[in-house]
């Protein structure tokens, strides 16, 4: 299986970043396309109720994906640092432990949700009207979530192993299969929401299998390995996973921010505008993961370069990489904002007939929502930087600001001040406030020498005592 020749310590930073960024971006956009394709076919095959039903289920998927991103990001940072020090076996052990852990974490709640789909749907905020559709979607979608969490973790590892194009291929396979099966199951077969869920499940399983097969048999430096099992080994396993989760916690919080955004937005739109409002917000929520993945692609493309050179102690390459990443974030954010500002009707029309009440609400709301996209991407990039140099506290703090500290109050206060536009402006204001906080933090570090000198980061103190 072909790999890219990538030397993280000597190649010029910009070409190196580009080599990671382009396939990572394409792969991540393909991952976002999986649920968006569901929405497009369901919108035309079932209607706005189908979109609303899927949107109610998505926060749970975001939570599972977030756990995968947390472990994957933490594992990737640890493995990068260990590889920079020549400790490839320690890196392999961390990778294997990470995948074992997420398998257990995904399997147990998935089984519970499959056993109690109605209770799960009601817990997520489904109305009685939408309940049958939400149950159908959950029943057929949940079984694939173990594979989804495998994909979330494995793509970090595959890129670090020097195969960013293969990581992109895993995502493309998932998206292509989903497009074909969505059309087949929703239109010729007439299976509606259930067909969309079944198509997505099959496509996710295919992508997950490709990723795991690579790590089992074809990986160059990070192939999965056998683990020892003893009381001491289990203690070390728990400690290593705890360290990975600590480093990657901000990645989980980033995904949790999307879940909070969708869950809180669903409740507020239901309160102010009913099912049509949820359907309109559902269209926005189909696009939000694309924006999230742009920011995530920038952060994840910079992460191997930053973490590896951080492990080597090469601060100049670390700073250069972050400058390139932030500039990329600003450019990408401006492009995305322009698209949503000038062509909302085109974007909404992919999902619903523009005469639909939900579509009309969405056309008016998307330009307001798009005000926050540049800040959204910048914040993800900045949080990814802190995560890559093992600065857990600022990474976690800024992720919490986006997801809880600012977002929830904005959803509560702004609609009371300005009605429906206030709901759309909640996310942008939250992201702007977070960006301001990050800038102030950077300025404080820059102009406070004592504080700056204490911020060199720390590698895993237990690196030499892995299982």
Question: Positions of the model-derived regions?
Answer:
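Helix-terminus/linker motif at the lipid-water interface of multi-pass membrane proteins
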Residues: 33-51, 121-128, 184-191, 252, ...
């Amino acid at each position: 299986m072909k790999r890219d020749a990538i030397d993280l310590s000597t190649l010029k930073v910009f070409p190196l970043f580009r080599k990671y960024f382009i396939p990572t971006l394409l792969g991540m956009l393909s991952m976002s396309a999986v649920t968006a394709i569901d929405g497009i076919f369901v919108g035309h095959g079932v209607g706005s109720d189908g979109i609303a039903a899927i949107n109610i289920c998505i926060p749970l998927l975001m939570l599972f994906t977030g756990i995968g991103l947390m472990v994957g990001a933490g594992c990737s940072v640890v493995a990068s640092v260990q590889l920079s020090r020549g400790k490839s076996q320690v890196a392999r052990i961390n990778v294997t432990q990470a995948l074992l852990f997420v398998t257990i974490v995904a399997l147990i709640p998935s089984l519970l949700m499959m056993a109690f789909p109605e209770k799960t749907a009601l817990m997520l905020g489904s109305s009685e009207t939408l309940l049958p559709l939400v149950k159908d979607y959950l029943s057929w979608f949940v079984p694939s979530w173990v594979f989804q969490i495998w994909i979330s973790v494995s793509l970090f590892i595959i890129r670090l192993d020097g195969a960013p194009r293969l990581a992109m291929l895993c995502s493309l396979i998932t998206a292509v299969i989903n497009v074909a099966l969505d059309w087949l199951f929703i239109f010729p077969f007439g299976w509606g929401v259930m067909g969309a869920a079944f198509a997505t499940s099959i496509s996710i399983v295919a992508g997950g299998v490709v990723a795991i097969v690579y790590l089992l048999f074809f990986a160059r430096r990070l192939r999965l390995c056998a683990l020892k099992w003893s009381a001491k080994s289990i203690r070390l396993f728990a400690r290593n996973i705890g360290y990975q989760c600590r480093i990657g916690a901000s990645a989980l919080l980033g995904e949790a921010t999307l879940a909070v955004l969708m869950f809180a937005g669903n409740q507020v739109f239901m309160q102010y505008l009913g099912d049509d409002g949820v359907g309109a917000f559902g269209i926005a929520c189909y696009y939000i993961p694309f924006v999230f993945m742009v920011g995530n692609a920038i952060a994840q493309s910079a992460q191997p370069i930053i973490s590896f050179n951080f492990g080597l102690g090469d601060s100049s390459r670390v700073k250069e990489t972050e400058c390139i990443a932030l500039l990329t974030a600003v450019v990408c954010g401006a492009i995305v904002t322009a698209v949503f500002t000038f062509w909302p009707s085109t974007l909404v029309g992919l999902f619903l007939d523009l005469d639909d009440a939900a579509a009309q609400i969405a056309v008016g709301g998307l330009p307001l929502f798009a005000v926050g996209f540049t800040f959204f991407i910048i914040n993800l990039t900045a949080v990814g930087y802190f995560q890559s140099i093992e600065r857990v506290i600022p990474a976690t703090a800024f992720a919490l600001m986006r997801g809880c500290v600012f977002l929830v109050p904005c959803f509560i206060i702004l609609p009371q001040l300005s009605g429906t536009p206030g709901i759309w402006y909640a996310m942008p204001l939250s992201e702007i406030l977070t960006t301001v906080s990050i800038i102030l933090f950077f300025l404080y570090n820059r102009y406070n020498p004592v504080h700056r000198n204490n911020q060199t980061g720390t590698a895993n103190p237990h690196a030499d005592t892995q299982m």
